[in-house]
Amino acid sequence: MAPSPSPVLPLSLPSSFLTRLFSWVLGALLIGAGLSGCSASGAGLNTFQSPDGRYAFLYPTGWNRVAVSDGPQVVFHDLINSDETLSLVISDVNDTNSLENLGSAVAVGEKLGRIVIAPEGSGRQAELVEAIEREDGGHTFYDLEYAVHLADRDRHELATVVVDRGRLYTLAASTNEARWPKVSDLFHSVITSFTLQI
């Protein structure tokens, strides 16, 4: 017995049906692409832990640690986009100080913007875009977002600050404004990963 022929769709399908079918297929492809991008955004992070085990954070795969003699305790930068950096600065503060004693998230964010990110005479202007307070592991963190304006370009910076045992920890990730939409989620994951462990 000969196999029955495969059904053939009539060529005279209504154009509205074809339009809907095309829209569904295109929508499914776009959703699939979007979901694969979301799942990849959490991937590609490595853990850095201080030699004494005091603190740890995540940094993007492919970034290299850079040795610095003055300033930040730890610096990483992207090999491909060399103006993308991640740095940890540790400063001494009064042992009795808490982050809340230094001011609200907005007050601390504005002060860091004026003194650290865009000090007078630096040629930079820092605009505090957002300041959020969060609790994690019994510590208060301030997560800060800045738009930084320089004479020849604009940059974006995310930072988190926390006080513990007389030290102010500031972890900051920075990129140029053109790359910001591509790395925003990644940078948020990095700065909120900072933890005090002992």
Which sequence ranges carry the predicted segments?
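Bacterial N-terminal signal peptides that target proteins for export
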Residues: A2-L26
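Alpha-helical transmembrane segments
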Residues: A28-G32
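C-terminal motif of bacterial Sec signal peptides marking the signal peptidase cleavage site
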Residues: A33-G37
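N-terminal "mature-domain start" segment
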Residues: S41-G71
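Soluble non-cytosolic domains of exported or imported proteins
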Residues: R54, L102-E110, E177-D185
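Extracytoplasmic/secreted envelope proteins and their assembly/folding machinery
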Residues: P60, G109-R114, S184-I191
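Conserved polar/disulfide-associated segments of primarily extracytoplasmic proteins
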Residues: V66-V163, L168-Y169
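Surface-exposed amphipathic alpha-helical segments
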Residues: G166-I198
